[in-house]
């Protein structure tokens, strides 16, 4: 028997939450911006009227204003968004114990074993959930209904806002295969460009490729994308309540060439810290400590860890702390073969605290600016893929220094 999977996507989530406090702006173009006072701030979200004007997530404010001069800009309130996300998740949990969050505004629900309790009609249940969220919270959803997670997500993207799309065994080829290959889960900008070089523009063309060819071209990701395009995704929906609490978030890499200068090492650390910080923000976690492991060409590992002054999920904080630890373990020009950066002593964002800096009263303002910057980076990557933007500290400062 096929599974029944929903993918629920809150429409224009940030903007929709803001409009609950500004109902008078509901019919005018509105965008939530990382820094509304700056022309170079980034659009984090927009409502439907702004979307109809051509405003796009992750573009700069001046670009959006050029398209839509009467665009109303509102500041972001991330704590409020997390509160509404929890309220929506509480509704989902009443329909199944298999609900998996995918970011702050998306969730998969496996209702295979509970559908009979709500009438047995999948589309009717999806519509009922949409109507309940709208009635109780004032927010709208798009819901995809399908027999696997990948197609359910394609369904929620297929028709917006406030809609339900069913992708079934009978119709999936006619709906899915004509779509651009970039619509498929985990096909980022680099993968789309690579596939395009081989004439693969649609999901159907991807499905027609030989699995062995894709594996040669893209490694394990090629095999995975082949399965996704052919309706073979079997990944389970993982219940939030059953998930093991995350105790650490880390990333490590072996470099193509040994690192011997501080500039090279800081660039490598920044790349790793970027990955760690991005995941922390996605999981709603803060790091209370940092650990660094340094490996030399003889495969000798040395590690050190320390408590951070205050919990953080910011790239800059993690990069600075990890670099300081590395310099305790390493003296240039001794070669470094590999590095690992791990965030430890994690806490949910609601439990994190910020320690006042008595010697630097501007520290809070700097953190707020950095939070806006990294939120903008998250928005750009969500829209254009993980490789769409690189944190500046990950670039070499001196010409001739190789990138890690």
Locations of regions flagged by a protein language model:
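Gly/Gly-Pro- and Ser/Thr-rich, intrinsically disordered tail segments characteristic of DNA damage-repair
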Residues: 1-227, 237-240, 278, 364-404
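DNA-contacting surface of Y-family translesion DNA polymerases
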Residues: 7, 183, 191-336
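Short, charged/polar surface micro-motifs in flexible loops or helix N-caps
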Residues: 13, 36-39, 297-300, 346-349
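Short small-residue beta-strand/loop micro-motif enriched in glycine and branched aliphatics
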Residues: 72-73, 300-304, 351-352
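Short, hydrophobic beta-strand segments
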Residues: 107-113, 303-306, 357-361
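A glycine-rich phosphate-binding loop feature that marks nucleotide/adenosyl-phosphate handling sites
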Residues: 147-150, 230-231, 286-297, 336-347, ...
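Acidic, metal-coordinating catalytic segment for phosphate/diphosphate chemistry
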Residues: 310-404
């Amino acid at each position: 028997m096929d599974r029944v999977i929903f993918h629920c996507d809150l429409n224009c989530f940030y903007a929709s939450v803001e409009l609950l406090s500004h109902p008078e702006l509901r019919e005018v173009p509105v965008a939530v911006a990382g820094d509304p006072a700056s022309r170079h701030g980034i659009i984090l979200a927009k409502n439907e009227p702004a979307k109809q004007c051509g405003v796009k997530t992750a573009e700069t404010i001046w670009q959006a204003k050029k398209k839509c001069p009467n665009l109303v800009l509102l500041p972001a309130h991330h704590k409020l968004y997390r509160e509404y996300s929890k309220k929506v998740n509480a509704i989902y949990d009443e329909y199944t114990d298999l609900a998996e969050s995918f970011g702050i505004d998306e969730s998969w629900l496996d209702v295979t074993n509970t559908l009979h309790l709500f009438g047995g009609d999948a589309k009717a249940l999806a519509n009922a959930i949409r109507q309940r969220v709208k009635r109780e919270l004032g927010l709208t959803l798009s819901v995809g209904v399908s027999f696997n997670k990948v197609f359910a997500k394609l369904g929620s993207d297929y028709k917006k806002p406030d809609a339900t799309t069913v992708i079934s065994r009978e119709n999936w080829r006619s709906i899915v295969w004509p779509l651009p290959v970039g619509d498929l889960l985990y096909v980022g900008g680099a993968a789309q460009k690579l596939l395009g070089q081989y004439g693969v523009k649609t999901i159907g063309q991807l499905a027609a490729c030989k699995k062995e060819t894709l594996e040669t071209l893209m490694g394990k990701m090629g095999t995975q994308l082949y399965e996704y395009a052919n309706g073979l995704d079997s990944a389970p929906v993982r219940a939030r309540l059953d998930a093991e609490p995350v105790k650490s978030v880390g990333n490590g890499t072996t470099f193509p060439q040994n690192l011997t200068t501080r500039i090279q090492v800081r660039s490598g650390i920044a790349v790793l810290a970027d990955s760690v910080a991005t995941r922390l923000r996605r999981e709603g976690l803060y790091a209370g400590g940092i650990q660094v492991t340094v490996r030399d060409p003889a495969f000798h590992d040395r590690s050190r860890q320390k408590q951070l002054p205050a919990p953080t999920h910011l790239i800059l904080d993690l990069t600075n702390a990890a670099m300081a630890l590395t310099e305790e373990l390493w003296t240039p020009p001794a070669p470094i073969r590999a590095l690992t950066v791990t965030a430890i002593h994690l806490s949910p964002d609601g439990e994190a605290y910020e320690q006042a800096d008595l010697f630097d009263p501007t520290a809070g303002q700097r953190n707020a600016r950095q939070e806006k910057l990294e939120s903008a980076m998250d928005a750009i990557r969500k829209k254009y893929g993980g490789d769409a933007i690189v944190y500046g500290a990950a670039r070499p400062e001196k010409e001739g220094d190789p990138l890690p």
